[in-house]
Amino acid sequence: MNRYRHALAATPLSLAVVLTLASGQVTADMQTETVEYTVNGETFTGYMAYDDEAEGKRPGVLVVHEWWGHNEFAREQAEKLAAAGYTAFALDMYGSGKLAEHPEDAQAFMKEATKDIDQVKARFMAARELLAKHDSVDGSKIAAQGYCFGGAVVLNMARLGVDLDAVVSYHGALGSPIKAEAGKVQPRIHVYTGGADKMVPSDQVSGLVKEMQDAGADLTLVSFPGVMHSFTNPGADKVAEEFNMPIAYDEQAAKRSWEGTLRLYEDVFSD
């Protein structure tokens, strides 16, 4: 069955949770935890957010950061998800302390992290295991969303057949040397991209559509006309000015993509 929709406008790993570095309270009920963990001997630092007053277990959502690294924006997305009723884990794909302040550093971190797809999958799966085992989480209900670099990561996890209920990519690269295979893609996929995103050319958009259609994947792709790269991040305009980058925040695209994401989660987790 082809469940495609298009709207235009197991890798070896060694995981150990080493230490919860800090915990805090963002609101009366929201708890946050900075979690240090190891994958194949390397240390990573993630951020868990959840409502500890909510009854029972709930779905978990992984948040994969932009190419800058695990930053405040990623943590804010985890907090937004917690406020919406989920337990969210903003994972770390680069390693503790690797947070770029300059595009050259971001590019170097990303290149090192993605040099081996087995390494990418191991780091993702370690975070997935951490989230699924959290006391507040129903481990059978897990989604993942990513931004820019993170958007490409979550799409590749879907291509690789990782057990996820939903995947959401925001302004992420859509092309990949990994290709989806028929019957292998498990999650429902939402892709939100900017029609004027110079980092995601139109051939990537059409290529993803064909790839997922051929694989029988459940894809919803929304392209916002005139919208540029990094449209979800309010800090994009400052970065664009500082480094002369073709990126820009777009309030309406950010709002509509977030609303679409919440509708997706409500739907896939309703059982």
Regions found by a protein language model. Give the residues of each.
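Short beta-strand/loop motif that positions the catalytic acidic residue
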Residues: V185, V191-T193, D197
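Short alpha-helix in the alpha/beta-hydrolase fold that links the catalytic acid
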Residues: Q77, P201-M212
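Active-site loop/turn elements of alpha/beta-hydrolase fold enzymes
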Residues: Y86, M93, G172, F224-G226
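Primarily recognizes the serine-hydrolase "nucleophile elbow" in alpha/beta-hydrolase
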Residues: F124-V185
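C-terminal catalytic histidine-bearing segment of alpha/beta-hydrolase fold enzymes
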Residues: Q213, D218-D271
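Bacterial N-terminal signal peptides
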Residues: A10-A22
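Serine-hydrolase catalytic machinery in alpha/beta-hydrolase-like enzymes
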Residues: T34-S136, P234-A248
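Acidic catalytic loop of the alpha/beta-hydrolase fold
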Residues: A196-V200, H229
